[in-house]
C-alpha cells in the first residue's frame, strides 16, 4: 500500500476514535443535576459532551489523561493494522481474510444490544449469507462428474495403461458372405451358397498403452493391442486367435514423431464407421492394413489454422489376406516405401474417436516388390511391382455433419486389402490392377445418437483376371450408434453386399448386424 494511503487511513481512524473517546469521557464526568437523558439524546452525543466539558472545569486534567492513554492505544492498534496491510501486500492477497476482520478497540465502543446488531455486524453477516447462497447455486448447477480415468500401473516412472473394447456382434446374412462373422466379399450365387448366422466376440480389442518419462521435449510411448480374428482373418470364421494390430514404440513432440514397430499403413488412413471389423472398419474401396515399419512424421504449421503434414515409412511385405492357395505372394528381400502428404485445418478433435481435424486433404502412395510362386508343374516364379496412388478427404460441416472418403488406384494390392484381396492372376501370373473408392456421411444427432451412411466399391481390371476370380465388389450400409453411457454403446447396421465373379453367378446378400460395445 502507498504511504499517502496509510496516512489517510491513520487520520480517519484517529478522528473517529478521538470523537468516540470524547463522547465517552464527557458522559463519565457528567454531574447528577445535568439535563435529562432524553434531552441529551435529542441534542446528540457530540453536543452533550461539549457542553458538559465546558461546565465542569475541575475535571479537565483527568479527561486529558484518559484521552492520552486512549490515543496511545489507538497508535498501537494502527501500527498493528499497518503491519497486517504490509503482510497482505507481500503475500499477494493471501492474508486478505484476517485484515477483513473489523477493528476492535477495547473499552471504546459502547456495549450493544445483542438483539440489535450494529452496521458492522450486519455487513459481516451479509457477505457470509451471499457466499453460502452462491455456493448452493453453484452446487446445484455443477455438471455430472466425468467418468473416472482409466486405471494405470506405474513402476519406476513408467505407466502401463490397459484399455480395450469388448464387442459382441450378432449377424444374419441372407446369403453366403466370406468368411461370415466379418465380411470381405459375397460368395458366388450358386445353389450351395446358404444363408448364415453368427454370434461373435471376435472384434474385441485388447491392449496397453505404455508411457515412459519424458526426455526433454520428447514423449516416449508404446502401444500393444490385438483383436481375436487370427493371422488369416479371411480363411477362418469364428475361430479365435490373436491378430496383433499395433506393436510399436514411438518418440514424439508437438511437431515430430518417430515410430518403429507394427502400425497402420500410411496409404488411405481414414476408417469408416461400419460395424464390419470395427474399430478398424473395412468396406470395399478401403486400402491399407497393419505391417512392421519404421516411420517419420512431421507436422509444420503454415499459418494459425493450417498445418502441412508429411509422413514417410519403410515397411515390410506381408500376406495377411491370402484367400486362394494357388498363388502365394512373398517379399523379394526389399522393403516397401510409403509416403503421405496432407494439408490439415484446425486441431485434432480429442472427442473424435480417430482424433480427426475439421478438414484434412491428403495424397499418399506406396511402392514395392512381390514375388509370386505358382504351384504346379513346373513351378513358376515371378517378381511384380506393387504400387498405389491414393486421395483421402475428411471434412466436417458445421458441428454435426462430417464427410469422409478415399480413392485409390494401383496394382498387386492383395495384402493392402485392394483388388478384392487378389494379388496375381494364377493362370498367367500377372499382377491384378484395380481402382476403388468409398464415401461416408456421419451425422451426430446429439451427444448420444450418431447415424452413418456409406457406399464403397473395389473394381479390378477384368483383363487381368482369370476364371473364378472376383471382378467387382460393392457394399452400402446404414447404421446407428447409441451411447447409453460414455463406455457402453449399442449399435445396429443394415448392409447390402454384391460381388461379381468371372465365369460364376454374382453373389448378393443382405446383412443385419446388432452389436454391444463396452469400452474400458
Question: What residue spans do the PLM features occupy?
Answer:
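Outer membrane beta-barrel
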Residues: 147-184, 188-320, 331-346, 353-355, ...
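Outer-membrane beta-barrel "beta-signal"
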Residues: 339, 482-484, 507-520
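Detector for outer-membrane/organellar transmembrane beta-barrel domains
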Residues: 339-470, 474
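N-terminal periplasmic/intermembrane-space "pro-region" immediately following the signal or transit peptide
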Residues: 27-179
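Bacterial N-terminal signal peptides
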Residues: 12-24
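Sequence/structural signature of outer-membrane beta-barrel proteins
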Residues: 173, 213, 228-233, 263-269, ...
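Bacterial N-terminal signal peptides that target proteins for export
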Residues: 2-13
Amino acid at each position: 500500500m502507498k504511504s499517502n494511503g496509510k496516512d489517510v487511513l491513520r487520520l480517519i481512524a484517529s478522528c473517529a476514535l478521538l470523537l468516540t473517546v470524547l463522547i465517552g469521557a464527557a458522559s463519565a464526568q457528567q454531574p447528577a443535576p445535568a439535563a435529562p437523558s432524553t434531552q441529551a439524546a435529542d441534542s446528540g452525543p457530540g453536543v452533550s459532551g461539549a457542553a458538559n466539558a465546558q461546565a465542569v472545569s475541575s475535571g479537565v486534567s483527568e479527561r486529558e489523561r484518559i484521552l492520552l492513554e486512549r490515543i496511545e492505544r489507538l497508535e498501537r492498534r494502527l501500527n498493528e493494522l499497518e503491519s497486517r496491510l504490509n503482510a497482505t501486500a507481500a503475500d499477494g492477497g493471501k492474508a486478505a481474510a484476517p485484515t477483513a476482520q473489523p477493528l476492535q478497540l477495547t473499552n471504546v465502543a459502547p456495549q450493544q444490544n445483542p438483539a440489535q446488531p450494529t452496521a458492522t455486524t450486519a455487513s459481516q453477516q451479509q457477505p457470509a449469507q451471499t457466499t453460502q447462497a452462491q455456493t448452493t447455486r453453484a452446487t446445484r448447477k455443477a455438471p455430472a462428474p466425468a467418468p473416472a480415468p482409466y486405471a494405470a500401473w506405474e513402476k519406476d516412472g513408467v505407466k502401463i495403461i490397459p484399455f480395450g473394447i469388448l464387442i459382441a456382434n450378432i449377424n444374419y446374412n441372407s446369403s453366403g458372405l466370406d468368411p461370415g462373422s466379418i465380411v470381405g466379399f459375397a460368395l458366388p450365387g450358386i445353389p450351395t451358397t446358404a444363408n448364415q448366422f453368427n454370434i461373435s466376440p471376435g472384434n474385441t480389442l485388447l491392449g496397453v498403452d505404455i508411457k515412459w518419462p519424458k526426455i526433454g521435449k520428447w514423449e516416449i510411448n508404446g502401444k500393444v493391442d490385438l483383436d481375436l480374428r487370427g493371422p488369416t482373418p479371411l480363411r477362418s470364421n469364428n475361430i479365435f486367435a490373436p491378430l496383433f494390430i499395433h506393436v510399436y514404440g514411438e518418440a514424439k513432440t508437438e511437431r515430430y514423431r518417430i515410430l518403429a514397430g507394427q502400425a497402420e499403413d500410411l496409404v488411405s488412413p481414414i476408417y469408416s464407421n461400419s460395424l464390419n471389423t470395427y474399430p478398424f472398419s473395412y468396406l470395399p474401396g478401403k486400402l491399407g492394413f497393419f505391417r512392421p515399419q519404421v516411420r517419420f512424421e512431421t507436422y509444420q504449421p503454415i499459418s494459425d489454422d493450417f498445418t502441412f503434414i508429411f509422413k514417410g515409412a519403410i515397411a515390410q511385405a506381408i500376406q495377411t489376406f491370402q484367400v486362394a492357395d494357388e498363388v502365394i505372394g512373398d517379399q523379394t528381400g526389399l522393403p516397401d516405401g510409403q509416403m503421405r502428404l496432407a494439408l490439415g485445418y484446425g486441431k485434432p478433435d480429442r472427442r473424435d474417436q480417430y482424433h480427426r481435424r475439421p478438414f484434412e486433404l491428403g495424397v499418399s502412395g506406396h511402392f514395392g516388390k512381390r514375388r509370386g510362386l505358382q504351384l504346379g508343374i513346373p513351378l513358376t516364379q515371378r517378381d511384380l511391382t506393387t504400387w498405389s496412388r491414393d486421395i483421402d478427404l475428411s471434412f466436417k460441416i458445421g458441428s454435426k455433419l462430417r464427410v469422409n472418403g478415399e480413392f485409390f488406384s494401383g496394382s498387386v494390392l492383395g495384402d493392402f486389402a485392394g483388388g478384392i484381396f487378389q494379388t496375381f492372376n494364377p493362370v498367367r501370373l500377372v499382377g491384378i490392377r484395380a481402382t476403388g473408392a468409398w464415401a461416408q456421411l456421419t451425422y451426430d444427432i446429439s451427444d448420444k445418437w450418431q447415424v452413418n451412411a456409406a457406399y464403397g466399391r473395389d473394381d479390378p481390371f477384368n483383363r487381368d483376371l482369370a476364371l473364378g476370380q472376383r471382378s467387382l465388389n460393392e457394399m452400402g450400409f446404414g447404421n446407428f450408434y447409441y451411447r447409453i453411457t460414455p463406455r457402453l454403446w449399442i449399435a445396429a447396421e443394415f448392409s447390402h453386399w454384391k460381388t461379381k465373379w468371372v465365369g460364376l453367378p454374382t453373389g448378393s446378400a443382405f446383412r443385419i448386424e446388432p452389436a454391444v460395445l463396452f469400452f474400458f
